[in-house]
């Protein structure tokens, strides 16, 4: 079950049209995990021998039966696609068996999705012991106008690429299972490295503006039954 605040959706859409009037056609990007797909159960069920590092070849072949489409995002994707805009997907998963993910998305979204055509794989780079996003490189190459994602790294990548970032609200059950990369890590409360807690998160939500100044897409998706 979900709620969409149509007035906010229309306002956001109109702002984007006026901001990017070139030909009336936008290049719109979407993250996959916790943005298009509620894929928590896939990652929780990764076999122990495929967890360190994560075997994305296994992950990409197991969305069917485990991942759930986040319906408000699907409706948003359909809005852009049906109005003639270019819809593209960029994930931090690696591309091994990426064709399986493309097939799964094609069946669920009802339009053709192909690896390296409108679905791109952009794994993080490990530098000095920390993972860093590489999505901005693909965003820049694709000349994206907008990018929708749930993670802090998605917002940072969009800003680096010159695209307008829009935060998708992460489901609470995903936050409880995996706190990092979402407004820092609110599960730890306020710390030097993570200055926000759940109270702060609700403040961001109510203002529809995130920690980097990004728009927050006003949806609440209750998650799996």
What are these model-derived regions, one by one?
Residues 94-225:
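C-terminal cap/substrate-recognition subdomain and adjoining C-terminal extension
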């Amino acid at each position: 079950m979900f709620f969409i605040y149509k007035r906010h959706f229309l306002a956001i859409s109109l702002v984007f049209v006026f901001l990017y009037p070139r030909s009336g056609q936008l290049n719109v990007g979407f993250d996959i995990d916790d943005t298009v797909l509620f894929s928590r159960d896939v990652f929780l069920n990764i076999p122990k021998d495929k967890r360190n590092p994560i075997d994305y070849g296994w992950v990409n072949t197991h969305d069917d039966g485990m991942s759930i489409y986040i319906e408000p995002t699907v409706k948003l994707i359909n809005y852009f696609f049906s109005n003639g805009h270019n819809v593209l997907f960029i994930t931090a998963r690696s591309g091994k068996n990426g064709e399986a993910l493309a097939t799964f998305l094609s069946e669920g979204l009802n339009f053709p999705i192909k690896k390296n055509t409108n679905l791109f794989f952009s794994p993080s780079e490990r530098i000095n012991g920390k993972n860093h996003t590489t999505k901005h490189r693909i965003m820049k190459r694709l000349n994206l106008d907008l990018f929708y994602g749930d993670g802090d790294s998605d917002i940072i990548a969009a800003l680096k690429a010159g695209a307008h970032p829009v935060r998708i609200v992460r489901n609470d059950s995903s936050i409880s299972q995996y706190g990092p990369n979402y407004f820092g890590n609110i599960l730890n409360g306020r710390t030097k490295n993570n200055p926000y807690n759940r109270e702060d998160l609700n403040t961001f939500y109510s203002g529809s503006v995130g920690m980097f100044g990004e728009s927050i897409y006003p949806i609440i998706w209750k998650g799996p039954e």
